[in-house]
């Protein structure tokens, strides 16, 4: 299985958030059975006070959460930098979450966690609602 869609687990880690200045922690991501996770989110307003970081812990509720050194990603003031992502490979603890800090009143788009390198394949995506993914290998040109 070489197709990306068959080798990842896609999780909606936090639905979009209304405008505000409060911090927004994602849901806890259980890394058991996976080597890595890519977190992706989008700030609605560019501001150099907006940033994301990743926290980890041993407890499933992350009451023991600690920041991972060097994971702070600042969105900046350039409107083209509103999407932020952090890739964590081989975390040292089982549970992770993305922690978004809003430096100005800003919305926060959906936050996704993409787990990869599952030790057992194929992983099952964890999204409520409908997830529509099609895979096309060497498709011919023509009407979609």
Task: Give, region by region, the residue ranges found by the protein language model.
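Surface-exposed, low-hydrophobicity beta-strand/loop segments enriched in small/polar/acidic residues
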Residues: 1-144
């Amino acid at each position: 299985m070489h197709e990306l869609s068959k080798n990842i687990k896609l999780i909606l880690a936090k639905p979009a958030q209304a405008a505000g200045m409060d911090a927004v922690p994602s849901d806890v991501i259980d890394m058991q059975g996976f080597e890595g996770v890519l977190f992706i989110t989008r700030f609605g307003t560019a501001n150099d006070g907006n940033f994301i970081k990743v926290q980890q812990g041993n407890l499933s509720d992350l009451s023991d959460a600690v920041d991972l050194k060097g994971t702070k990603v600042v969105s900046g003031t350039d409107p083209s930098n509103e999407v932020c992502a952090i890739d964590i490979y081989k975390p040292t603890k089982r549970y992770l979450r993305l922690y978004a800090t809003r430096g100005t009143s800003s919305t926060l788009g959906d936050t996704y966690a993409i787990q990869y390198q599952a030790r057992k394949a194929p992983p099952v995506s964890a999204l409520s609602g409908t997830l529509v993914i099609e895979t096309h290998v060497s498709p011919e040109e023509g009407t979609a």
